[in-house]
């Protein structure tokens, strides 16, 4: 679809996965029949960003992980809306310096559970054009591992890092990030596992985060400067941590505005507008309802299930 730009984006994505040792090739001779049957194909998604550049993302089919992970393991904590709003209010009231940050490729910086700890190996099957890209990147490592299945070239790899698409990926990253933060003195809030505080220069530094999106605040901007350096030292080896300073921050779909002293304004107009623009079903003028709960919602017996496309739209929006 995206031509040479798409290929370049795919190469860049696979290259950075290889640099981070996200997977290792597995000989078909060393695999059990069960491992081979459970291996799912890797998918490469290409999307066009706002700046017209193409972003590639290799995604793992999450179905195999459902079988050996508990419900608790696949449910990653999420910052409460109240926590986001209350910490923003405290930042404004105390006149704190605020910094928002985004850690690149967070999931793949977290290691998968080791097979010798009672967990099964997670095997991924790479097929099609992705095989050619892997061989181009490292022919000596991946070339001998190619096998043919139904006329297709296939490479099996053992997944070593939490790749996007895995149900456990967000939780593995959370556990790693939490451990790192506790190592530098942060104490986590007992009511919200995505909020943490520590004392620095006789004042509180507060961080709140949702996966890899972080907001840090402290009275002294130098504390945030040092925290930014620490984030890059720990998680920016293969791509710098992006940060935003100043009075206005685009964070978790909200525009957080501290321009008025002692006040904070939360604006989600842009987020709602983008959501409406991206919504695939277009309504005609006047085709509205005051409520989705019509008078017939509980009548008429068993209704027909909506089709797959509409179900996915409902889940997304």
Regions found by a protein language model. Give the residues of each.
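Long, low-complexity, charge-biased intrinsically disordered regions
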Residues: 1-317
